[in-house]
């Protein structure tokens, strides 16, 4: 696991929040999540304000890989929650979750 030094000399995992707001960047955001997970970085993927538009077999397989690697997938769009297995997140919940991230990557 990827660990960094904490403020008091303790160790903790590195956590990244990948925020995908641009529908044209959905695949790049997902690929970034996979790359981070392969480096043993905790990942929270957020797809905001739109439904996945590029859902094909490759995207579906990559989402399954994110799930296998214990990545977390969230969306505030009901279509993603109902059709693609994302967990629902409100904007206030999003704010709390990304506040715990060491790195925030926007798309």
Where are the regions a protein language model picked out?
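An anion/phosphate-binding loop that grips the pyrophosphate of nucleotide cofactors and donors
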Residues: 101
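Glycine-rich, highly charged phosphate/nucleotide-binding loops
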Residues: 84-93
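Short internal beta-strands
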Residues: 43-51, 71-77
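Histidine-anchored nucleotide/phosphate-binding helix
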Residues: 25-41, 45
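Short, glycine-rich nucleotide/cofactor-binding loops
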Residues: 15-29, 48-55
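Positively charged, low-complexity intrinsically disordered leader regions
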Residues: 2-12
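A glycine-rich helix N-cap at a beta->alpha junction
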Residues: 58-84
């Amino acid at each position: 696991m990827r660990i960094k030094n904490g403020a008091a000399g303790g160790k903790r995992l590195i956590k990244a929040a990948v925020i995908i707001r641009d529908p044209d960047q959905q695949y790049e955001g997902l690929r970034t999540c996979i790359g981070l997970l392969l480096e043993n970085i905790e990942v929270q993927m957020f797809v905001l304000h739109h439904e996945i538009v590029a859902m094909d077999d490759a995207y579906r397989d990559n989402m399954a890989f994110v799930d296998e690697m214990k990545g977390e997938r969230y969306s505030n769009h009901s279509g993603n929650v109902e059709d693609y297995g994302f967990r629902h997140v409100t904007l206030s919940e999003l704010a709390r979750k990304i506040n715990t991230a060491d790195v925030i990557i926007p798309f």
